[in-house]
Amino acid sequence: MKSSYQKQLDELITSLSDKKPSLLLHACCAPCSSYVLEYLSEHFQITILYYNPNIYPQTEYERRLQELIDFLPKFEPAIKNKIQLIQTEYNPEEFYNAIDIKTNPELAFEPERGERCRRCYKFRMQKAYDYAKQNNFEYFCTTLSISPFKDAEKINILGNELQNLSESGP
């Protein structure tokens, strides 16, 4: 039976009452962030983590980051709480090592939503989870499942695996 992640989220939000817990949101770009921020900002203190070493070339990485930076002040009237942004250094070697491209060069030619993407989702989500845990965030999530180009089912499975790693959150 498929999970209703929207129902689970709604139940979580209802259980929060007036509390606004901290949430680390891994974001891939501004467009995918907009709905998530609008929906969740009323209920959480959100910090965005822009960690995307998979984006190539570096100019595209920087363009997406700049779009996110430019987007946040324009979007402020629609959000309920101030959003923080954490930027990471561009390091594509981390990505190549994580997906093991040297051992599996065929991954470079896989279509969207294939094994390379699954490894990429896992890598970035693990980094976000680790950051959230190290910095005492109460929750973490990603915008990746919002994108029509990504495999939401794989992303949700990976999210559940991370959730099961620790009973103490994030």
What are these regions (language model features)?
Residues 1-35, 43-170:
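Nucleotide-activated chemistry modules centered on ATP-dependent adenylation/adenylyltransferase
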Residues 40:
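Aromatic pocket-lining residues of Rossmann-like dinucleotide-binding sites
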